[in-house]
């Protein structure tokens, strides 16, 4: 029983480490996207945002994702593109 608990704790620690790495990657990408958007002229920025939003609207995920996950992705993209980090 102790071995099982120890194994579970090790797996949990690994998952937490993976989650931290993903969080850092997402934050780094947010910073890069924000910097790129800020260095673009307004018209080019708006055109890029519209292209991204249209591409997201046209994509059909395979395998299909649930509506809540799709909505979460759309909300996050809108926040990132329309209201970038300060």
Swiss-Prot record:
It comes from the Bacteria. One of its GO terms (cellular component) is cytoplasm. InterPro entries: SigmaS_Anti-adapt_IraP. Disulfide bonds: none annotated. Residues 1-38 form a coiled coil. It is found in: Cytoplasm. GO terms for biological process: cellular response to starvation. It holds the Pfam family Anti-adapt_IraP. Keywords: Coiled coil, Cytoplasm, Stress response. Belongs to the IraP family. Interacts with RssB. HAMAP family: Anti_adapt_IraP. Inhibits RpoS proteolysis by regulating RssB activity, thereby increasing the stability of the sigma stress factor RpoS especially during phosphate starvation, but also in stationary phase and during nitrogen starvation. Its effect on RpoS stability is due to its interaction with RssB, which probably blocks the interaction of RssB with RpoS, and the consequent delivery of the RssB-RpoS complex to the ClpXP protein degradation pathway. This is Anti-adapter protein IraP. The lineage of its organism: Bacteria, Pseudomonadati, Pseudomonadota, Gammaproteobacteria, Enterobacterales.
